[in-house]
Regions:
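Active-site-adjacent loops and short helices of periplasmic peptidoglycan-processing enzymes
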Residues: 2, 33-226, 230-235
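Catalytic-site microenvironment of enzymes
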Residues: 7, 87, 259
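Domain-terminus/edge residues, biased toward the C-terminal soluble/receptor-binding domains
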Residues: 203-204, 216-472
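Membrane-proximal periplasmic segments of bacterial cell-envelope enzymes
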Residues: 11, 36-38, 349, 369
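N-terminal Sec-pathway targeting helices
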Residues: 1-16
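Membrane-interface motif at the C-terminal end of an N-terminal transmembrane signal
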Residues: 22-35
Length: 472
């Protein structure tokens, strides 16, 4: 048997290793250019990403935020003692006046009542067409003095949807009481539920003791009311066209009366008090004075008690942009003066907001970006926006063409050609920058969506060849 040529075998081994090395490098280079399907992050990885992003970026964790650029505070002729206006698409605060003052919300409380109802409907536990029983404590005749009323009466047949209309349009305290009794079995349980929802939203200055808004011990602030209104409209946009935008409401109607009450006279005199049996249809206009008066107004809710003054949660949508404003402690010695103040303040805020800002939407940019990855166990890193505003609030005054300021918005997408080595979840690798006339409006970081570990030495060496020898 011939003696093996050790030197020759060594050279063959080196050549084989070198060939394998070059093949590996070639495969890596090819797949970098033409990547296979990228593995989606699992639920655990997505949950970690959400946690890290919420900790790192303030604009994710808060309902309301200051504008991401500096502006000169507006000096508006607003008679209400406290007020705020926000861009509903992103929560940017456009205007504020003593917005952290605690004030009774009065009947704006009923927005929280409707919020709970919508939640219960979503679970399937209750439905809009449910017929709601009316115990004596829900009748109009048993409401406190000077209550706003839907005019619920003994033996009435009323649906949950009608009670919601009565709460939203004519601000019926009796309707709110009936809803509380039906949804949670009583006022105390319903108030506990309302306050739980308040806490879940992080509203620390808001608290309720009853559901109609009659009590001066109910408390909120314009800022927290605006935050709630934003969440309410985001989660239940149907509330606007189904309830808050309705101009009037007539109750009771023929179908609401029991058989025995249908034979009673339809004309009644309430000047000496409200009877148990109500058979006369009562027509009431929506308490929001800007509905049908101010272009684009489709909600939201008024409130008044002596301790709160004339409150108004107002929302208007024009040209795709929705503004929410809250005015509280509005002045007026009578209802007519209070309504005039609501119209004046609401119009002043909305006129200014729509003439000063526009919403810019570009959803195509707020997507995933696949970046080549070398020296790592995977060959692509997916970058996602750290947060995704529905729209960018653009200041009209910064544009040269104030008629079409959105045409001047410039977008700068900054991405790396490739990423080297291990990647941590939520690690920044680029950004989307929006500018107007050289002013940065907002810069949204692009971050990795999951962890990718460093590759072994063999793969890292192959990637080195891919990068330098194969010109990748």
């Amino acid at each position: 048997m011939k003696k093996l040529n050790i030197k020759k075998l060594s050279l063959l081994a080196v050549a084989a290793i070198g060939a394998a090395y070059l093949v590996t490098a070639g495969i890596r280079a090819y797949t970098l250019r033409r990547p296979a399907k990228i593995a989606e992050p699992d639920e655990k990885q997505l949950a970690l990403l959400e946690t890290l992003l919420n900790e790192k970026y303030e604009r994710r964790g808060k309902i309301l935020l200051p504008l991401p650029y500096r502006t000169i505070p507006a000096e508006l002729d607003v008679g209400a003692e406290a007020a705020i206006a926000i861009d509903a698409s992103n929560g940017n605060i456009l205007y504020e006046k003593d917005a952290d003052r605690q004030i009774p919300p009065a009947s704006m409380t009923k927005l929280f009542v409707l919020y709970v109802v919508f939640q219960e409907i979503a679970t399937g536990r209750i439905n809009l067409d449910d017929v709601v029983p009316l115990p004596p404590e829900t009748w109009a005749c048993n409401m406190p003095p000077h209550s706003s009323l839907m005019f619920l009466g003994k033996n009435h047949i009323v649906t949950l949807e009608e009670l919601m209309l009565g709460s939203a349009i004519c601000s019926g305290n009796d309707a709110a009481c009936a809803i509380a009794n039906y949804v949670c079995g009583g006022m105390d349980s319903f108030i506990n539920r309302m306050n739980q929802e308040v806490q879940a939203l992080g509203l620390t200055q808001t608290h309720f003791v009853e559901a109609s808004g009659y009590s001066e011990k109910n408390m909120t602030t314009p800022r927290e009311m605006a935050a709630f209104a934003k969440v309410y409209l985001e989660r239940y946009p149907e509330s606007l066209y189904k309830f808050h935008s309705k101009l009037s409401f007539t109750y009771p109607q023929e179908h609401n009366l029991s058989w025995e009450d249908k034979s009673l006279p339809k004309h009644q005199d309430f000047s000496q008090g409200i009877p148990e049996h109500i058979t006369m249809p009562v027509y009431q206009k929506n308490t929001n004075p800007l509905l049908g008066l101010y272009e684009g107004c489709d909600g939201l809710k008024t409130g008044y008690i002596d301790e709160s003054g004339y409150n108004l949660a107002l929302t208007v949508k024009r040209n795709g942009m929705r503004i929410i404003s809250i005015t509280m402690e509005g002045k007026g010695s009578c209802t007519a003066e209070g309504q005039a103040g609501r119209i004046h303040d609401g119009s002043a805020i909305m006129d200014w907001a729509f003439s000063t800002f526009r919403d810019y939407e570009n959803p195509l940019l707020l997507r995933e970006y696949s970046i080549p990855l070398i020296f790592a166990k995977e060959q692509r890193a997916i970058l996602v926006p750290a947060y995704k505003p529905k729209a960018l609030t653009v200041p009209v005054t910064a544009a040269q063409n104030r008629e079409n300021p959105l045409e001047e918005v410039q977008i700068n997408l900054v991405l790396p050609d490739k990423i080297k080595g291990a990647v941590n979840p939520a690690q920044e690798f680029g950004y989307i920058e929006y500018t107007l006339n050289g002013h940065i409006l907002e810069s949204i970081p692009l971050v990795s969506e999951k962890e990718i570990k460093k590759a072994c030495l063999w793969v890292r060496a192959a990637d080195l060849v891919s990068q330098f020898v194969l010109k990748f």
